[in-house]
């Protein structure tokens, strides 16, 4: 994302198996933030159910994106999954699953998790389309990590504010 190159250059960077120093720094920062947020959350049975639904929901959103968003390239795992499936039917099923999970999360008091996931999903679409020309498997993984940490932050904030 930090490259000023065009979409083709950014896709080439994604293919590179080497890891740069700034990637390692960001990875360590991510782990520290995730660990800190996990330490802030009191995992009660209710929170355990919320978190389980949230993890299922983020993966359903990831699948929905592969089925609904444009693809950045004609190769790779995301392309394989998208072209091997009936995209319309997959979109319908995953959209229904996402809606049911959102209702379940909201009913348990996890509206902030739904809001966080929705915001990250919208950002995912904008970044994937604008910077890469569509979705790739690497971007799907990026979305999962972003979505998970933002939902964990929302969960921690709700507990801290006494909402949960």
Regions found by a protein language model. Give the residues of each.
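Active-site His/Glu-centered metal-binding helix of metallohydrolases
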Residues: 1, 61, 140
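Multi-pass membrane catalytic core of lipid/isoprenoid biosynthesis enzymes
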Residues: 1-46, 50-51, 89-104, 144-151, ...
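Divalent metal-coordination and catalytic microenvironments
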Residues: 14, 59, 138
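Membrane-interface segments at loop-to-transmembrane junctions
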Residues: 15, 78-85, 141-146
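Transmembrane alpha-helical segments that form the membrane-embedded catalytic/substrate-channel core
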Residues: 52-68, 118-128
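Solvent-exposed interhelical
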Residues: 60-94, 131-135
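Hydrophobic core of alpha-helical transmembrane segments in multi-pass integral membrane proteins
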Residues: 89-108, 113-125
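Interfacial loop-to-transmembrane junctions
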Residues: 126-150
């Amino acid at each position: 994302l930090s490259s000023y190159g065009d979409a083709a250059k950014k896709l080439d960077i994604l293919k590179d198996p080497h890891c740069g120093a700034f990637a390692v720094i960001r990875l360590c920062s991510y782990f520290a933030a995730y660990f800190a947020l996990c330490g802030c959350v009191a995992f009660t049975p209710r929170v355990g159910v919320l978190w389980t639904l949230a993890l299922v929901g983020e993966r359903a959103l990831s699948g929905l994106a592969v089925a609904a968003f444009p693809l950045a390239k004609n190769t790779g795992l995301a392309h394989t999954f998208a072209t091997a499936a009936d995209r319309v039917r997959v979109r319908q099923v995953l959209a229904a699953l996402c809606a049911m999970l959102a209702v379940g999360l909201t009913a348990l008091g996890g509206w902030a998790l739904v809001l966080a996931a929705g915001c990250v999903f919208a950002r995912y679409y904008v970044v994937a389309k604008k910077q890469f020309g569509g979705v790739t498997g690497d971007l799907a993984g990026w979305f999962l990590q972003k979505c998970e940490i933002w939902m964990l932050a929302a969960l921690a904030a709700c507990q801290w504010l006494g909402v949960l």
